[in-house]
């Protein structure tokens, strides 16, 4: 697994409400997480965004998992990008091309799974780990392209500060400030995590034609021009609206921790089929046939990761 290193961390200030001239957007929906409890791979599982085909394009799935033993052994992917963020603990990642790495709390990894991706995600040293993973659609023209990985260490995130707010921009841009360069991926997104003291606020300026999700890890906030309340494990979704710069206002009711995702819709039909995200059910079935025929490559002979491939 290749790891990209980025330039020295930048320190800057978020725009205050008086500095920003962008139009503030209102939240479209607030969605409660669905608690699934224990699953075959996870000791505790929450669907922040259950697998949808296009409602929040380009975001297809957002899921939180906690595990300390099995985790997600060798499994395939095709036609999808993933952004995995480590909430707590350490996550071990391997792929069948020989890549290996360990992500710690606050680290992230971006993967584009084109024609063939075969990997596993495990609790490092069998100690508890909690992750949040987003699935992001790929355009049809890129679903059979090459597979790539980029590690995004917390230490390399762009640090953005203002009174009562500490944010880390992992990828994308906010108010002219940039995170890691992931321009090699086909559907660039912006992703940041932020800690807010009670009564603190900030504005996230983004193009109006992007979908935005504000997920509350802890505490309670108000978001958008209508000051919509969002509590722990709730997510406020903002529809794509128009071209031009807009602002997503986040105000902390209590001390709060939030994760913010934004991306431009792909605008193509898509079908989720187990670990595959193609444009038709037939293409998903073909991917599974190719995986079973061994076309994704051999599964390494590693006693800790040789369980049957797991479908998320």
Walk through the language-model features, giving the residues of each:
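Jelly-roll (double-stranded beta-helix
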Residues: 1-312
């Amino acid at each position: 697994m290749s790891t990209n290193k980025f330039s020295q961390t930048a320190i800057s200030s978020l725009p205050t409400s008086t500095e920003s001239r962008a139009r503030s957007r209102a939240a479209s929906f607030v969605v409660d997480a669905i608690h699934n409890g224990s699953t075959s791979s996870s000791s505790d599982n929450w669907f922040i965004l259950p697998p949808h085909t296009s409602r929040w394009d380009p975001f297809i799935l957002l899921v939180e998992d906690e595990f300390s033993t099995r985790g997600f052994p060798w499994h395939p992917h095709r036609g999808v990008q993933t952004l995995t963020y480590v909430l707590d603990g350490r996550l071990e990642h391997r792929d069948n091309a020989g890549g290996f790495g360990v992500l710690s709390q606050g680290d992230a990894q971006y993967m584009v799974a084109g024609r063939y991706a075969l990997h596993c995600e495990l609790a490092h040293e069998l100690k508890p780990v909690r992750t949040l993973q987003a699935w992001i659609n790929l355009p049809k023209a890129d679903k059979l392209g090459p597979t790539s990985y980029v590690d995004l260490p917390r230490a390399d995130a762009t640090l953005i500060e203002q009174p009562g707010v500490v944010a880390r921009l992992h990828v994308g841009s906010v108010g002219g400030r940039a995170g890691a360069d992931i321009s090699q991926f086909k559907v660039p997104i912006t992703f940041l995590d932020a800690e807010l003291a009670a009564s603190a606020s900030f504005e996230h300026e983004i193009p109006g034609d992007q979908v935005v999700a504000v997920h509350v890890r802890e505490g309670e906030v108000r978001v958008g021009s209508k000051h919509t309340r969002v509590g722990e494990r709730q997510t406020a979704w903002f529809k794509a609206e128009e071209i031009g710069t807009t602002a997503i206002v986040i105000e902390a009711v209590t001390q709060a921790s939030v994760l913010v995702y934004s991306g431009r819709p792909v605008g193509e039909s898509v079908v989720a089929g187990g670990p595959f995200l193609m444009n038709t059910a037939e293409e998903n079935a073909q991917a599974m046939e190719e995986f079973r025929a061994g076309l994704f490559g051999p599964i390494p002979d590693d006693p800790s990761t040789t369980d049957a491939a797991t479908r998320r």
